[in-house]
Design a protein with these regions (language model features):
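Long, well-structured alpha-helical subdomains associated
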Residues: 78, 94-158
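Active-site helix-to-loop segments that bind/position phosphate- or nucleotide-bearing substrates
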Residues: 38, 66, 70-76, 80
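An active-site-proximal "capping" alpha-helix that borders the catalytic cofactor pocket
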Residues: 81-96
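Active-site recognition of the HExxH zinc-binding catalytic motif
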Residues: 49-62, 86
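Hydrophobic (often cysteine-bearing) scaffold residues that line and stabilize catalytic clefts
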Residues: 1, 48, 82-85, 124, ...
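Catalytic zinc-binding patch centered on the HExxH motif and its immediate surroundings
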Residues: 3-33
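Short pre-active-site segment immediately N-terminal to the catalytic Zn-binding motif
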Residues: 36-50, 76
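Non-Sec secretion/translocation targeting segments of pathogen effectors
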Residues: 156-174
């Protein structure tokens, strides 16, 4: 869990903080402050899912800086479209890494997508696919780097230490 969260923090385009949120929200992306805030003390899978959801918002829904290759800002998206995209990205990324968020994600997407027309939902599919792919690749690269750093640290810790005692010195009892 710690390595995965460290990888998420590294792929996030904005800083991530953990704190108590006074509203019902589990997290949020603040475009004006350029930061993500995640609710303290949630379970591991909820924390991961929320972090990925908010990173998706930071990549896709910052009006001044869309950060996904091949995605243009285009016309203004409704809040419901933004929520469907962010949660769908979170679900896809979490599923890839074996974290099942379907119970929460399906209800969340269904709630935000009700009343949407099929062409509007299809439009978001390419955005979801590209964003999830970019995040998965970034997370995998960061996890490899974290594991490489750990193995190098462990190798250094296991290097033999050679002590040389000079025979010319006298040691006095204390």
């Amino acid at each position: 869990f710690e390595d995965f969260m460290k990888a998420l923090e590294r792929v996030s385009p904005v800083p991530m903080e953990y704190m108590d949120i006074s509203s019902e929200a589990k997290g949020y992306f603040s475009p004006s402050e350029q930061r993500i805030v995640i609710q303290n003390d949630m379970g591991e899978s909820q924390t991961v899912k929320t972090a990925v959801h908010e990173i998706a918002h930071s990549l896709l829904h910052d009006k001044d800086n869309v950060r996904v290759e091949g995605i243009e800002e285009g016309e203004k998206k409704s809040r419901s479209t933004k929520e469907v995209e962010a949660e769908s990205v979170a679900y896809t990324v979490c599923q890839h890494f074996g974290i099942d968020t379907s119970e929460y994600s399906f209800a969340y997407v269904a709630g935000w997508s009700s009343g949407k027309e099929m062409p509007e939902l299809k439009e978001s599919m390419d955005t979801i696919r590209k964003t999830a792919s970019q995040l998965i690749t970034g997370i995998e690269n960061e996890l490899r780097e974290i594991q490489l750093q750990r193995s190098q640290t462990m190798e250094k810790a296991q290097e033999p230490v050679t002590l040389v005692v000079a025979e010319c010195c006298e040691y006095h009892a204390l």
